[in-house]
Amino acid sequence: MTYNEDLKREIPTGWKVETLFKNSLTKLIKTGIPTFEGEKIYLPTACISEDRITDTTTKITYENRESRANMMPIPNSVWFAKMKNTNKHLYFGDYSQDRIKQIILSTGMCGLECPDYALEYLWNFIQNKQFEDTKDVLASGAIQPAINNNDLNSIWVLVPDISVLKMYSQRVKPLLEMKYNNEEENFKLEKLRDFLLPMLMNGQIKVG
């Protein structure tokens, strides 16, 4: 074990302490989305509760989207809400392609791209209460306090040895993938509901 001045505690020898803004595991995802045809589901932060998508009814086109609908999820990325006192997190693994193709996120979310072997570790990191507490302390602004990219320089990340990260990923990835698959089934059922409900209300289809 080695004492680390930044964390004020001992850490395993060979592990590193870096900032969330600049570290060997993540890359900040920039705003901007490619053009797309048809409609996509827009997820403002209000449609996310903790780590669950709660509302998929807001549809946008590339031309009619609001300015905040400008973040594109990518495989192997974790996301958290920037605003103070908002416990909202999302992750996208290499198995999340179907969902990624369908949704656009708000600029109220901060996205971090990471290697596949570090996704589960970083997901655990941003879900930790200590991370949320630190985020809330750093948040600034008179009306809607939130953190900005520079604030990420003040959030420390403990970076384990790559062999530890791979071992952790090997054990946790199947659980997250199972969770995602269950959510995706619900996601598809919600889309079917949203498609059929107007037809039912208009008398285009009948039940029974």
Predicted regions and their residues:
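Non-catalytic DNA-recognition/assembly elements of restriction-modification systems
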Residues: 1-32, 158, 162-208
